[in-house]
Amino acid sequence: MQTWTDEGEEIPLTGGDVTEGLVRLGDTVRRPRGERWELVRAVLTHLESVGFEGAPRFLGVDSAGREVLSYIDGEVAGRPRPPWIADEDRMISVARLLRAYDDAVAGFGIPSDLPPPIEPPGLPELDDPPELVGHQDITPENVVFRDGRAFALIDFDLARPVSRAREVVNLLLWWAPLGADEDLDPELRGLDRPRRCRHIADAYGLSRPDRLRVMELAIALNERAWHLMKYRAETLGGGWQRMWDEGVGDKIKSRQTWLEENADSITTALTS
């Protein structure tokens, strides 16, 4: 077990869109406990027990009540995006890392005592039985690279019971990526999205039944995303409100149109 101390200089870290108060202290990361921090602790403890190296170690809770995690050295694709963000070999390595994570976490099961998710009125229903506790936030900021390959996943705040197909939808969203060029980072525009989706599905090892339904699932999840983002902005504020004010709702609706227009070509690429 890695030892740690509360002494030393705290260095602020750039988190994702909604994580605030993230700091590095020595060889550890301190982060405020989220609403599902106990699930995160249990998942990270399980991953350590099965020898999965691609995630932080949960070390405890400090005197300020923050989670203490091991710091994983490497590079992440913050903003502005680095030129290598569109590199297909890196993209494929992310898919392989996610598959390794999903295989490792599958033995953890799905806890029976998890509180039901808080869902806003009018949220479209989703028929997609969960298989494992997925990461569900495979953004460029949450993948640590070493020597040009994805080494570890960080930030498990959105971990929840999902299907493998839903994990791949999240992966495609950020790394294909899914959406109209004008809504993407400049470094990710003009790419052959159907081909990249196929590479991701192949690297992950997505089953044929899941390949046939993954775009239908992406459309359904994107529709739900608009309702969830609006609800979180209204009830949680903070980073959620900032993203909503910056137009994320409009981008989600634009992506919905793009998904519907491109679903057939991507499904063909995934299954041919």
Residue ranges of model-derived segments:
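Actinobacteria-biased recognition of intrinsically disordered, low-complexity terminal regions
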Residues: M1-V18, E261-S272
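ATP-binding pocket architecture of kinase catalytic cores
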Residues: E9-H135, R146-R149
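Short, polar/flexible loop-turn hinges at active-site or ligand-entry regions and domain interfaces
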Residues: P80-W84, R160-V162, G179-L184
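Amphipathic alpha-helical interface surfaces
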Residues: L97, R146, R164-E167, R193-C197, ...
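Catalytic activation segment of kinase domains across protein kinase-like and atypical kinase folds
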Residues: P117, G122-D128, L132, T139-L178
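Active-site activation/catalytic loop segments of kinase-like enzymes and analogous catalytic loops
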Residues: V168-G205, L221-T235
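Short, surface-exposed acidic
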Residues: L206-E216
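ATP/Mg2+ or Mg2+-diphosphate-binding catalytic cores
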Residues: A225-S272
